[in-house]
């Protein structure tokens, strides 16, 4: 029996360190296909086995056939000044494009990215927020299926509204091309949906959680579609570790209902995509560990739509897209007589393009508008309109250097304009070593809560401003790659809520600085074994007080050991977050202790003609006390088993 490649296997297509978007990857045996995204990353088509032939094609390039393997594929395009470029496969890894990790849980997907932290208010019932490089959760832009998840009320992106089944792989970019505006100071996290084979999944754990989902998917010559529906239930009774004691918390129950639909059509040189995602959450709000609440609850909903039409040209593409997001929340707490409702809607339309003028010049642009509406018992009814335009030019072989320059202009209806820029200069010293330097700016617009909260909203707020500089060096060898970087981020006009005596009000007062020294690396010890890891040292300061920034640890690190072979798949991962100040107080400061989060999973050899897959996992393997938000400890060690039954697995060999 041929060995099937796990559906988590990814690849990337690049051309002289530039990603190649919208290439088709076709399995010649099964006729199933995938399309690379705008960053050149693709998933291996479903049902692919070791030794299958994959055809890589895109207008403007000669079609190439390669043999599939379990090792993440890096496909590089070599340019020709006369003919269209020919696709060639390189055996080395790419230091410029670190292949994303995939995992069985939200924690695994997010924590596998360099410098990231996933902050949660306890278990599944708590809000989950991502942060990076010791920054705030509002400084990392999060996109799911190209849809901005930012809540315009508070500027945050609640990842607990996305069921694990929605999450395929994650990637982070530095927003060098300025495709994104407000809230992207620390970068942009792209969460890509996972294309699951048709079948059903059932997961259960010792904590009493139950997870059930059903999927259908298929692809034909010109189009593919997939749909899913499911439910996730957690009674919230699994004990947490706090002060070295196991404590069973009350009112942490969580019920989630979700559905999703995705269709992709390719016809000649046209691509079109449409997706719908929906989730409903009903959860208890347990409160702080030392001040529990057994009555509060929240019901929240999330509805997402994304549609795009893409025209591919030999030297680029033109893309038009429309996205819509609707998020609603009802919070009820009879103890404090609170019954609040919050509804936010946002619709965005944009046009983007990529054009390679010649072998040295590449031009990109991104233009669009968005409308945000909120209706809240605490904020009232408000609408914000914004439009934007960004443009960038990349120049290769510029006196031995590669140069990138980008600028962006955002215009808001409620406070004016914001201008940002981005520049990067890089050079190859040797075939295996390169250096680069970058600098740029970013901003964060005041949220509706900042502007209109009753009482205390301040409509005279200005946007926050940040400026960064970064120097890095990358080394690439036959089976490994490493990066060393130093980054400095300075921010001003930071919005801080201060007491007026009668109520709290936001003002632009604070300034801060962060210096981040980071090392990333990955090593392929064999075709089946890979080690990945990163570590960040962060030195931060609130310039108004001279103190270390709150919620900014000195150290963030992660490592992962992954092995795939003979139908088995296993990985062990560890994430470390250093201690951090929560509040400066007298006589002692309030702080969070260091966290060491560990996870182990084992995928057992599929049985019954590859139709039944079993995965065993252990979260918090070392059974450490975990707390990423002060007062909300997370679950102790837990065991889970996931069983999936996949349909239509038998494919005739040609």
Where do the protein language model's features map onto the residues?
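Short, acidic, small-residue-rich periplasmic hinge/interaction motif at the N-terminus
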Residues: 15, 24-28, 57-61, 69-108, ...
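Short acidic/polar hinge/loop motifs at secondary-structure boundaries
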Residues: 43-45, 147-174
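A beta-strand signature from Gram-negative outer-membrane beta-barrel systems
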Residues: 75, 161-201
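Extracytoplasmic beta-strand/coil segments of soluble accessory domains associated
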Residues: 107-151
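Outer-membrane beta-barrel signature, preferentially recognizing the C-terminal barrel domain
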Residues: 140, 196-201, 291-308, 312, ...
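Flexible loop and strand-edge segments within Gram-negative outer membrane beta-barrel domains
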Residues: 234-240, 246-258, 269-348, 625
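C-terminal beta-signal and adjacent terminal beta-strands/loops
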Residues: 237-240, 490-492, 531, 576-583, ...
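Gram-negative outer-membrane beta-barrel transporters
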Residues: 488-490, 508-581
């Amino acid at each position: 029996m041929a060995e099937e490649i796990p559906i988590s296997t990814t690849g990337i297509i690049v051309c002289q360190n530039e990603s190649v978007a919208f290439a088709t990857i076709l399995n010649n045996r099964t006729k199933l296909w995938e399309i690379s995204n705008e960053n050149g990353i693709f998933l291996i088509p479903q049902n692919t086995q070791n030794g299958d032939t994959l055809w890589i094609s895109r207008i403007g390039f000669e079609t190439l056939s390669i043999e599939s393997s379990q090792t993440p594929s890096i496909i590089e395009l070599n340019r020709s000044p006369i003919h269209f470029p020919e696709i060639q496969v390189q055996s080395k890894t790419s230091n410029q494009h670190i292949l994303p990790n995939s995992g069985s849980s939200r924690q695994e997907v997010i924590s596998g990215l360099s410098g990231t932290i996933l902050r949660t208010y306890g278990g599944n019932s708590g809000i989950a927020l991502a942060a990076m490089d010791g920054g705030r959760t509002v400084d990392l832009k999060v996109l799911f299926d190209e849809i901005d998840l930012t809540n315009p009320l508070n500027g945050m992106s609640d990842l607990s509204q996305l069921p694990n089944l929605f999450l395929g792989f994650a990637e982070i970019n530095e927003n060098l091309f300025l495709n994104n505006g407000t809230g992207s100071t620390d970068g942009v996290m792209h969460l890509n949906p996972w294309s699951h084979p048709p079948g059903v999944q059932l997961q259960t754990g010792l904590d009493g959680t139950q997870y059930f989902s059903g999927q259908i998917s298929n692809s034909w010559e010109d189009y593919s579609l997939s749909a899913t529906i499911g439910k996730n239930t957690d009674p919230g009774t699994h004990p947490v570790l706090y002060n070295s004691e196991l404590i069973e918390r009350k009112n942490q129950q969580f019920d989630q209902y979700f559905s999703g639909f995705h269709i992709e059509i390719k016809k000649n040189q046209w691509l079109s995509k449409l997706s719908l995602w929906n989730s409903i959450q009903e959860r208890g709000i347990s409160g702080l560990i030392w001040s529990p609440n057994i009555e509060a609850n929240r019901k929240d909903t999330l509805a997402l739509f994304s549609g795009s039409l893409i025209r591919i040209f030999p030297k680029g593409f033109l893309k038009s897209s429309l996205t819509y997001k609707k998020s609603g929340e009802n919070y009820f707490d009879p103890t404090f007589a609170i019954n609040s409702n919050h509804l936010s809607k946002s619709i965005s339309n944009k046009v983007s393009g990529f054009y390679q003028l010649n072998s040295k010049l590449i031009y990109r642009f991104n233009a669009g508008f968005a409308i945000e509406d909120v209706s809240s018992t605490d904020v009232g009814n408000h609408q914000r309109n914004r439009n934007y335009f960004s443009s960038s030019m990349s120049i290769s072989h510029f006196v031995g250097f590669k140069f990138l320059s980008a600028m962006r202009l955002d215009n808001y209806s409620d406070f004016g304009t914001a201008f940002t820029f981005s520049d990067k200069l890089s050079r190859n010293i040797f075939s295996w070593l390169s250096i680069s330097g970058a600098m740029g700016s970013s901003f964060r617009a005041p949220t509706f809560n900042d502007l209109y909260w009753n009482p205390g909203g301040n409509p005279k707020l200005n946007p926050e401003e940040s400026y960064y500089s970064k120097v890095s060096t990358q080394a690439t060898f036959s089976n490994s790659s490493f990066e060393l970087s130093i980054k400095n981020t300075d921010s001003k006009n930071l919005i801080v809520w201060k007491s007026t005596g009668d109520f709290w009000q936001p003002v632009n007062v604070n300034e801060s600085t962060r210096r981040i020294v980071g090392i990333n690396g990955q090593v392929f010890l064999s075709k089946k074994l890979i080690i990945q890891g990163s570590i960040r040292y962060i030195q931060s300061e609130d310039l108004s007080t001279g103190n270390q920034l709150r919620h900014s640890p000195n150290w963030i690190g992660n490592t992962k050991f992954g092995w795939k072979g003979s139908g088995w798949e296993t990985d062990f991962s560890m994430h470390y977050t250093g201690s951090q100040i929560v509040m400066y107080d007298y006589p002692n400061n309030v702080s969070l202790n260091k966290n060491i989060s560990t996870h182990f999973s084992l995928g057992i050899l599929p049985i019954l003609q590859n139709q039944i897959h079993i995965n065993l996992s252990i979260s918090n393997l070392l059974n450490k006390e975990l707390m990423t938000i002060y007062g909300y400890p997370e679950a102790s060690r837990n065991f889970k088993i996931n069983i999936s039954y996949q349909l239509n697995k038998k494919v005739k060999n040609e």
